Regions:
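Surface-exposed loop/turn positions within long extracellular repeat scaffolds
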Residues: 4-14, 24-78, 90-109
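Acidic/His metal-coordination segments adjacent to aromatic residues that form catalytic metal sites
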Residues: 87
Length: 109
């Protein structure tokens, strides 16, 4: 997805979602895709814990988690993870990302 804006529709299936381009893209649907997520450029915002499907996330740019709840997906890559939005968010996956963590709002557990 080489675009910005908000994508509200549900994404399903076994494929991978790839975020490219410098813009900010928000995924707000309750997605069930299983092929994982690759963030190669820009910022990908997840507005709920289901927004990134069930696969692992490779973050080589910026992943913004604008939600509370429990995020089960494993996060790897060289990019930054940002917690925004109200509420407490628990990262329960086997995370190995190296780009640092920014908490701009809410609580990260």
């Amino acid at each position: 997805l080489n675009t910005g804006g908000t994508f509200d529709n549900a994404i399903s299936g076994s494929g991978q979602v790839v975020k490219s381009g410098d813009d900010v893209l928000t995924l707000s649907g309750a997605n069930s895709y299983s092929g994982g997520t690759l963030i190669s450029d820009g910022t990908l915002v997840a507005s709920n814990v289901e927004a990134l499907g069930t696969g692992d996330v490779t973050d080589n740019a910026t992943l913004e988690l604008n939600t509370g709840g429990t995020f089960d997906n494993a996060i790897s890559g060289s990019g930054q993870v940002e917690k925004s939005g109200d509420g407490a968010l628990t990262l329960s996956g086997a995370n190995s990302y190296s780009g640092g963590t920014l908490i701009s709002d809410g609580t990260l557990i």
